[in-house]
């Protein structure tokens, strides 16, 4: 995109154009506000790619892999609408494996209460983190499917992609 003359900005924990800890509500709120401040006339697209793997705590996995992406997308949706932009959410090919807990997927997508979801995550043992990872990514993909018709009414496209293992700082 940059090679084509487009401006690309990123939100990252360290070293991004906008620095924010997206695993916290304060970080998500600050990131959304920073994008609004910089691009009040709208944005062409959003790629929500933040996440942590199964070595993180269950709470951090749910906070970053599920809630942060949704809150960014919803918080920036009006900016996307101004330019009829699109949103891509990064899910994972792990959503098809045996570690997905459909009860957790249902809880995340139906409850939509971040505080209660994170309370559940705090009660889970670290040994459940692989299931937390795949379940959070499955829930994110399900959320995208649920909201895509409403986004389409506004002329917006939203989709989830499920790449395989990709060389990122998380996988190195």
Where does each model-flagged region fall?
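Rossmann-fold cofactor-recognition segment
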Residues: 11-28, 36
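Canonical Rossmann dinucleotide-binding motif of NAD(H)/NADP(H)-dependent dehydrogenases/reductases
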Residues: 1-9
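A hydrophobic alpha-helix adjacent to the NAD(P)-binding/active-site core of NAD(P)-dependent oxidoreductases
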Residues: 17, 61-62
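Catalytic loop of short-chain dehydrogenase/reductase
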Residues: 52-59, 81-154, 165-168
């Amino acid at each position: 995109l940059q090679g084509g003359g487009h401006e690309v900005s990123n939100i990252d924990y360290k070293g991004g154009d906008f620095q924010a800890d997206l695993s916290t509500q304060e970080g998500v709120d600050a990131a959304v506000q920073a994008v609004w401040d910089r691009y009040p006339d709208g944005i062409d697209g959003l790629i929500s790619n933040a996440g942590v793997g199964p070595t993180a705590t269950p709470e951090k996995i749910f906070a970053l892999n599920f809630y942060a992406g949704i809150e960014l997308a919803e918080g920036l949706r009006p900016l996307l609408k101004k330019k009829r932009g699109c949103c891509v959410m990064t899910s994972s090919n792990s959503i098809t494996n045996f570690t997905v807990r459909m009860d957790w997927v249902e809880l995340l997508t139906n409850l939509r209460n971040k505080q209660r979801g994170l309370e559940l995550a705090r009660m889970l043992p670290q040994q459940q983190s692989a299931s937390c990872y795949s379940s959070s990514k499955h829930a994110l993909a399900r959320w995208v499917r649920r909201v895509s018709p409403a986004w389409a009414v506004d002329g917006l496209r939203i989709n989830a992609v499920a790449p395989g293992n990709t060389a990122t700082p998380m996988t190195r």
